[in-house]
UniProtKB/Swiss-Prot annotation:
Cofactor(s) it depends on: K(+)
Upper taxonomic lineage: Bacteria, Bacillati, Bacillota, Bacilli, Bacillales
Residues where GTP binds: 231-236, 250-256, 275-278
A single GO BP: tRNA wobble uridine modification
Residues reported in the UniProt entry to bind Mg(2+): S235, T256
Identification of the protein by name: tRNA modification GTPase MnmE
A GO term for molecular function: metal ion binding
Manner of cofactor binding, per the entry note: Binds 1 potassium ion per subunit.
Top class in the EC scheme: hydrolase
Enzyme Commission designation: 3.6.-.-
Organism encoding this protein: Staphylococcus aureus (strain NCTC 8325 / PS 47)
C-alpha cells in the first residue's frame, strides 16, 4: 500500500521522564537520518535496535535534543511499515521541536488513530482488534484490560472467521448442487444439511451474545447511581467504595451539587459510580442544575443504590424517591447504623418488598463487604466469569451479532418452509456480510474512518 510517512507525539502531553515522537511510513528512516547524529546512520543499523545520539537542526546545526532512537523495519512492526521512535526527554518544548523537524523534513502530522488504522489497512490487525486497542487504553480495571487484550490477541476475530468460513462452506455446497446437479460425487445440499449447519452457526452467535451484557459491563463499567435524600451519606458511601475524598462531605444538606463520577473495581465487577445531588424541589439555581443531571443519570443507570438514614424515620420524600427507582435494579441501603435508630426497618421492608436490603455504617466502614457481594451477585450470579473467556463487549459488535442472528434465522425459516435453495442463499450471504463488518472485511470506508477518528493522537 503506497502511503506517505506520518509523525506524531505518542506519549501524553506534559512534563515527564520521556516523550516519544513516532514516525511510520516508507521514508521514516530517511527522515530520521536527516535529523539524527550518532555512531551510525539509522539506515545502516539492524532492525529492532535502540541507538543513542542527538537530534540536530540541519539548518542551524544546533543540538536540539539528546535521544534514544528505536529503528523497527517493515514488515515486523505494528503498522507493517518502517517505524522510528525518537525517545526524548519529557519536556514539552523540546519534544514539540523534534516533532516540527520531522514534519519540516518530509513527514505529515498523523490523524487521530492513524497508526492503528495503518495496522488495519496493512492487514496486521482486523477491525475488532483495532477497536480493542482503544478499549485497552481506556480500560479502568484489570478485568476490563484483560477482556480488551483477549480481543487484541484475536480471540473474537477467530470465532467470527470460523463462522464466516462455515457459511461459505454451506454456500459452496448449495452452489455446486444448483449448478451441477448431474455430479454424482458431490454431496447433496439437502434441506436437512442446510438446517443443521445454519442452526449450529446460530447457536454460536447466541453463545457470543450471551456474553454481551457482562462484556459491556467489563468494557464500560456498570453505571451505578447512588441516590437518596440530601445528607443520608451518599458521598460517604462513594468515598468508602473508591477509598478517596472526591465528593464533598459536610453536615449541610445539599452540598453535593453536581453528578460526581468515579470508576472502582468491586470484586471483579467494574463500577462506574455516580453520586447524585439529592433529588428534591429547590430554588437554588446551581443545586437545581445538579438535580436535573441526577434525574438524567438515574434514567441511564444499570444499578441504583438507594440510601436511607437510620437516624431518621421514613418520610414522604423517601417514598417518592423509591417510586422513581423501584422498577430498576435497586439495592436499598440503610446507612448511619452507628447512630440512634429512628427508622422502622419493618416499614422499610414493606416499602421495598423483595428488593435487597443492606445495613451499613460508612463512618465505621461496616456493611461495605456485604454491599459489594450483593452487587456482584445481582449481575453475575454470585461469580464473575473467567476473564480469559471471550466476551463481546463492544456495542457495535453486539448490534451486528443481533442482525446476523436474525438473518440466519430468516435462512432457517425459509428452508423449513420449503423456499428454493437459491433464495435461502440470500439470507446466508447477508449473514456472512454482517459478520464480516465486525472484523472489517465488509465494512464501509466511512465506518472505518469514523471509528479511527475516535482514537487519540499518536496511536
Amino acid at each position: 500500500m503506497d502511503l506517505d510517512t506520518i509523525t506524531s507525539i505518542s506519549t501524553p502531553m506534559g512534563e515527564g521522564a520521556i516523550g516519544i515522537v513516532r514516525l511510520s511510513g516508507p521514508q521514516a528512516v530517511e527522515i530520521a537520518d536527516k535529523l539524527y547524529k550518532g555512531k551510525h546512520l539509522l539506515n545502516d543499523v539492524p532492525s529492532h535496535t535502540i541507538n543513542y545520539g542527538h537530534i540536530i537542526d540541519p539548518e542551524s546545526k544546533e543540538v536540539v535534543e539528546e535521544v534514544m532512537v528505536s529503528v523497527l523495519r517493515a514488515p515486523k512492526t505494528f503498522t507493517r511499515e518502517d517505524i522510528i521512535e525518537i525517545n526524548c526527554h519529557g519536556g514539552i518544548l523540546t519534544i514539540n521541536r523534534v516533532l516540527e523537524l520531522t514534519m519540516t523534513y518530509g513527514a505529515r502530522m498523523a490523524e487521530p488513530g492513524e497508526f492503528t488504522k495503518r495496522a488495519f489497512l496493512n492487514g496486521r490487525i482486523d477491525l475488532s482488534q483495532a477497536e480493542a486497542v482503544m478499549d485497552f487504553i481506556r480500560s479502568k480495571t484489570d478485568r476490563a484490560s484483560k477482556v480488551a487484550m483477549n480481543q487484541i490477541e484475536g480471540r473474537l476475530s477467530d470465532l467470527i472467521k470460523k463462522q464466516r468460513q462455515s457459511i461459505l462452506e454451506i454456500l459452496a455446497q448449495v452452489e455446486v448442487n444448483i449448478d451441477y446437479p448431474e455430479y454424482d460425487d458431490v454431496e447433496d445440499a439437502t434441506t436437512e444439511f442446510l438446517l443443521e449447519q445454519s442452526k449450529e452457526i446460530k447457536q454460536e452467535i447466541n453463545r457470543l451474545l450471551d456474553t454481551g451484557a457482562q462484556g459491556k459491563i467489563m468494557r464500560e463499567g456498570l453505571s451505578t447511581v447512588i441516590v437518596g435524600k440530601p445528607n443520608v451519606g451518599k458521598s460517604s458511601m462513594l468515598n468508602n467504595l473508591i477509598q478517596d475524598n472526591k465528593a464533598i462531605v459536610t453536615e449541610v444538606a445539599g452540598t453535593t451539587r453536581d453528578v460526581l463520577e468515579e470508576y472502582v473495581n468491586v470484586r471483579g465487577v467494574p463500577l462506574r459510580l455516580v453520586d447524585t445531588a439529592g433529588i428534591r424541589e429547590t430554588e437554588d439555581i446551581v443545586e437545581k442544575i445538579g438535580v436535573e443531571r441526577s434525574r438524567k443519570a438515574l434514567s441511564q443507570a444499570d444499578l441504583i443504590l438507594f440510601v436511607l438514614n437510620n437516624n431518621e424515620a421514613l418520610t414522604q420524600e423517601d417514598y417518592t424517591l423509591y417510586e422513581v427507582v423501584k422498577n430498576e435494579d435497586v439495592i436499598v441501603i440503610v446507612n448511619k447504623m452507628d447512630l440512634e435508630q429512628n427508622i422502622d426497618i419493618n416499614e422499610v421492608k414493606d416499602m421495598i418488598g423483595d428488593t435487597p436490603l443492606i445495613q451499613t455504617s460508612m463512618l465505621k466502614q461496616e456493611g461495605i463487604d456485604e454491599l459489594e457481594i450483593q452487587i456482584r451477585d445481582l449481575f453475575f450470579g454470585g461469580e464473575v466469569q473467567n476473564q480469559d473467556m471471550t466476551y463481546v463487549s463492544n456495542s457495535r459488535h453486539i448490534s451486528l451479532l443481533k442482525q446476523a442472528r436474525q438473518t440466519i434465522q430468516d435462512a432457517i425459516d425459509a428452508a423449513e418452509s420449503g423456499v428454493p435453495m437459491d433464495m435461502v442463499q440470500i439470507d446466508l450471504t447477508r449473514t456472512w456480510e454482517i459478520l464480516g463488518e465486525i472484523i472489517g472485511e465488509t465494512a464501509s470506508d466511512e465506518l472505518i474512518d469514523q471509528l479511527f477518528s475516535q482514537f487519540c493522537l499518536g496511536k
